Structure formats: structure tokens, C-alpha cells
């Protein structure tokens, strides 16, 4: 009997951590120190709700309450109060990721005081935009949901209750970002800027400042902000990132903390040198990823799954992670290949839980692709993504560049939710016959 400890990973597969090495120009400058310079740090006015009534914007009590929240975090309180009142909501659900959950009680108090509503703070884990829990909010008899910290991945016309997405833009030290990049990267380089949704609003200001050439010759960068629709320009998710045409830029610049979203962009663009600027620590670091090791591990799982006799199909139930249409497409693929399978609904997927299904030879999970990429080696049987399952049964060839297009509208095939084959038809108003 195998030891349990061996099946529990000490860390997830993250390639390699940041390292110090030569910069693009061959120098070995410390990428964590940069001199400050003065730039135009005007903030983008995008996403401002211009229709908010003046009596809400100028309400002294509301503005005093807002001061209880961090001033560099934009929780869009005025806009939220306006929407709650406009919709005549009675019970409002507040869904926040773990990093913002500490502000849940303050937000709840504000809306109960100024909107005369009952609020429910949803405390279940929220990993990303795919975890929006509109169905649970409806089951709790809520008529309005405010989802914080993520982009509008599930359109509001596809939710059973009214939903307001609040990105929670975070103000950062734009001067330090730009000076750090100008100090450490060769002038006139071609750069691609990406980040998480909290910092996407700052990317255009950073781009404008980087394109300016200073008197000392630094700067003058050619900067692009790539987009993977339906995401915002420059936005990266852990499973969906923009593909940047090979040779079009010299380096990738990621604005954000942590590596999870950055790794997605690096996987999609394996030939690009990558830098990460952490707005909290004010450090610029060179990042790397063990692409060949990751692809070798994943292809080995695909090869092993090809000989499996019985499959387990996991439909993720954490928020909106699962996709009934993707699941049905996978069922059809397994049927065509005469494979036996069983469907399992699961909110979170753990090795110990799947280990209880001793008769399953391989798994395919419609939840989070990164679960297989980062943790797949830790499971007792191959745990494939929908893309990997499609490659296993020759629906699509194995790609040299691992695709990170799970929510992209131009994805490779019907094993992704937003592929044209799987997208729901738009709601159209019925019209009567036209009289002549």
C-alpha cells in the first residue's frame, strides 16, 4: 500500500520562481531598485457611471462612510447604492474574494444604512470570475448580487438575478512603475503590458508614460496592450490570456502580485521574456516558467488516459465553473470512442476525494484547467482538462504551445465555454407582424 504522504504535494507546479539574471540589454542591474522620476499620473476615467444622481454623489453621510474603506481601493459605493435603489432591491448578496472579505461587514453596513436593504455576505471560497454564485444568491431569495474583484465573465443577461460587477480598481504608484521599467529595460524596447483586473485601469497611463523618451534617452518604448476577448484589454485570467504574435514584442510586463495570472500569460507566450512588477512591494522581478517540464507532465497524462477503460467526468459546481454544453460535448466524444464514463458533480476537487473512486481509470474535469496543469501530478489517476481530453481522442492535435483560451471567444474548439458553438443565443425581443 502506497504511503499517503507521497500523494500530497508540498507545492503546486509553478515552473520556476523569479530569478535574478541579465536584463534584455545584457546588464545585471538590480531590478528591485529604481530611481523615481516625475510623470503625468492622471488616472483613466473609464467605467465612471456618469448617471449617478448628484444627491448620492454629494451625500455627506455616504462620503463619510466611504472613508472607512481603503482610499486607494475603488469599491464604487455611489454606483452600487444607485443601482440597488434603482432596482428597488430588498435583499442584496455581497460576494468577495478572500483578499477583500475583510471589508464585507463595512460594505454590508453601508448598504443596509443607505439603501434600507437586507444584506448577505457570501463567505464561500471565490477563486475568480468563474466563481460568481448567482444561483446560490437566488436560492437565498436575493434579488441583487454585487460581485467584487473580478471581471464580467458571465454576462449580466445570463444571470437569474440582477448582478453588478465591481472590479475594485486599485490606485498604484504609477511613477514608480514607469521609472522602474525605464531604469531596468533598454530604451526603445517593444513591450506588452498585461495585469489583473484591479490594475487594468492603469495600463493605458503606464503605456503613455513609457512611450515618452526622457532627456537622458531613457524610455521611448513601443507598447501594446493585448486582449483576449471577451476580457478587457490587458486583462489576464489564470486560464485565459492573450496570445502575442511571436516576434512582435521584446518582453512581457505583468502588473500584479503573485504568479498565478502571470503564469497563464507565460504559458500562452513561452518565448517571451517576462517581468513582474508588484504594486504592493514596489519590486520588479524577472520571471521564468518550466514550459517543457509542464508539457511533458501533461502529455504523459494524456497518453495514459488514452488506454483508460472507464472515465469520470467532473462538472464543477463552484459558482459558474462548470459548463453543461462542454460536458455534453465531452460525453459525445467518449461515446464515439466507446468509453464507459460516469458524471460527478463536485465543487472542489481533491486527490483524496477522487481516490475513493477506485474503479475510475482517468478523469476529465470541467472546472478549472489550472487544477490539472498545476496539481495534476498529485492525483491518483490522470486528471485531464477538456482540451487535453480532446487531444487524447484526436479531436485536436497536441499543440506545441499549450493553449490558455478557456474563456476566449476565439478558442480552439467546443471544449471551451465561450466557443461559438457553445455560446447561448442572444435574447431577442419578439416583434409582431409588419403590416403593409
Swiss-Prot record:
Domain of life of the organism encoding this protein: Eukaryota
Pathway where it operates: Protein modification; peptidyl-diphthamide biosynthesis
Entries under InterPro entries matching the protein: DPH1/DPH2, DPH1/DPH2_1, DPH1/DPH2_2, DPH1/DPH2_3, DPH1/DPH2_euk_archaea
Record's catalysed reaction(s): L-histidyl-[translation elongation factor 2] + S-adenosyl-L-methionine = 2-[(3S)-amino-3-carboxypropyl]-L-histidyl-[translation elongation factor 2] + S-methyl-5'-thioadenosine + H(+)
GO BP terms in the entry: protein histidyl modification to diphthamide; regulation of cytoplasmic translation
GO terms assigned for molecular function: 2-(3-amino-3-carboxypropyl)histidine synthase activity; 4 iron, 4 sulfur cluster binding; metal ion binding
Residues covered by region (Disordered): 1-27, 417-436
The record's free-text note on cofactor binding: Binds 1 [4Fe-4S] cluster per subunit. The cluster is coordinated with 3 cysteines and an exchangeable S-adenosyl-L-methionine.
Record keywords: Cytoplasm, Iron, Iron-sulfur, Metal-binding, S-adenosyl-L-methionine, Transferase
Binding site for [4Fe-4S] cluster: 130, 239, 368
The UniProt record lists the keyword Protein biosynthesis: no
Annotated knockout phenotype: Sensitive to methyl methanesulfonate (MMS, causes DNA breaks) and hydroxyurea (HU, ribonucleotide reductase inhibitor).
Cofactor requirement: [4Fe-4S] cluster
Compositionally biased tracts (Basic residues): 7-19, 426-436
Subunit structure comment from the entry: Component of the 2-(3-amino-3-carboxypropyl)histidine synthase complex composed of dph1, dph2, dph3 and a NADH-dependent reductase, predominantly cbr1.
PANTHER family from the UniProt entry: 2-(3-AMINO-3-CARBOXYPROPYL)HISTIDINE SYNTHASE SUBUNIT 1, DIPHTHAMIDE BIOSYNTHESIS PROTEIN
Function: Catalyzes the first step of diphthamide biosynthesis, a post-translational modification of histidine which occurs in elongation factor 2. Dph1 and dph2 transfer a 3-amino-3-carboxypropyl (ACP) group from S-adenosyl-L-methionine (SAM) to a histidine residue, the reaction is assisted by a reduction system comprising dph3 and a NADH-dependent reductase, predominantly cbr1.
Family, per entry: Belongs to the DPH1/DPH2 family. DPH1 subfamily.
Protein name: 2-(3-amino-3-carboxypropyl)histidine synthase subunit 1
